[in-house]
């Protein structure tokens, strides 16, 4: 018997951290919710990280996901910006981990490949495929859309692992 798994995808960022929640049952995907947690750019770094933590903790507590997926960050030329993004990503991993969830990580190219079929694509392609895969999906902005794509990537990857385990067992 299959059970419904609720997944939260998180697209970390210091200004805006996107989140998207889906449910998966077998091959089917269902949109649950999406949004963005923001931090006040006028505040110090520690306070901004607290804002992200508290906002994500509220989402995790409210929607009770079973698993989490976070996008891996890329290193850019601005070392300070990369470090700050890494700290926001730490919050994005800490919140679900503290709630007892398994946290998976996916490279941006893996997320795009899972949703649009290729590792390099435009935001508009991702938005379009989200609507194809989940017609009831609602998202405001790229961060929430990216978070939904991360959740879908995890759903596809966990399904592949489950299928391989079933084949080995049977």
Curated annotation (Swiss-Prot):
Reactions this protein catalyses: Endonucleolytic cleavage at a junction such as a reciprocal single-stranded crossover between two homologous DNA duplexes (Holliday junction)
Coiled coil: none
Biological process per Gene Ontology, one example term: DNA recombination
EC number: 3.1.21.10
Residue sites binding Mg(2+) 1 per the record: 11, 143
Enzyme class: hydrolase
Family statement drawn from the similarity comment of this UniProt entry: Belongs to the RuvC family.
GO cellular component: cytoplasm; Holliday junction resolvase complex
Keywords: Cytoplasm, DNA damage, DNA recombination, DNA repair, DNA-binding, Endonuclease, Hydrolase, Magnesium, Metal-binding, Nuclease
The protein's name: Crossover junction endodeoxyribonuclease RuvC
Cellular compartment(s): Cytoplasm
Keyword Cytoplasm: yes
Active site per the UniProt annotation: 11, 71, 143
InterPro entries attached to this UniProt entry: RNaseH-like_sf, RNaseH_sf, X-over_junc_endoDNase_Mg_BS, X-over_junc_endoDNase_RuvC
Positions with a binding annotation for Mg(2+) 2: 71
Bound cofactor: record note: Binds 2 Mg(2+) ion per subunit.
Cofactor or coenzyme needed: Mg(2+)
PROSITE patterns: RUVC (PS01321)
Function (record text): The RuvA-RuvB-RuvC complex processes Holliday junction (HJ) DNA during genetic recombination and DNA repair. Endonuclease that resolves HJ intermediates. Cleaves cruciform DNA by making single-stranded nicks across the HJ at symmetrical positions within the homologous arms, yielding a 5'-phosphate and a 3'-hydroxyl group; requires a central core of homology in the junction. The consensus cleavage sequence is 5'-(A/T)TT(C/G)-3'. Cleavage occurs on the 3'-side of the TT dinucleotide at the point of strand exchange.
Top-level lineage group: Bacteria
Molecular function per GO: crossover junction DNA endonuclease activity; DNA binding; magnesium ion binding
Quaternary structure (record): Homodimer which binds Holliday junction (HJ) DNA. The HJ becomes 2-fold symmetrical on binding to RuvC with unstacked arms; it has a different conformation from HJ DNA in complex with RuvA. In the full resolvosome a probable DNA-RuvA(4)-RuvB(12)-RuvC(2) complex forms which resolves the HJ.
């Amino acid at each position: 018997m299959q059970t419904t798994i609720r997944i939260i995808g998180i697209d970390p960022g210091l200004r805006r951290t996107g989140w998207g929640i889906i449910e998966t049952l077998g091959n089917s995907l269902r949109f649950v919710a999406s949004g963005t947690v923001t931090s006040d750019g006028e505040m110090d770094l520690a306070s901004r990280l607290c804002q992200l933590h508290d906002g994500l903790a509220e989402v995790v507590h409210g929607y009770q996901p079973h698993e989490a997926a976070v996008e891996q960050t890329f290193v850019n030329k601005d070392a300070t910006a990369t470090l700050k993004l890494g700290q926001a990503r730490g919050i994005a991993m800490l919140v679900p981990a503290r709630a007892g969830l398994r946290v998976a990580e996916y490279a941006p190219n893996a997320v795009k490949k899972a949703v649009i079929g290729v590792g390099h694509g435009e935001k508009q392609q991702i938005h379009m495929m989200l609507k194809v895969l989940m017609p009831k999906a609602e998202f405001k902005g790229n961060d929430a859309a990216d978070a939904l794509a991360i959740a879908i990537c995890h759903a596809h990857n966990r399904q592949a692992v489950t299928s391989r385990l079933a084949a080995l067992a049977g």
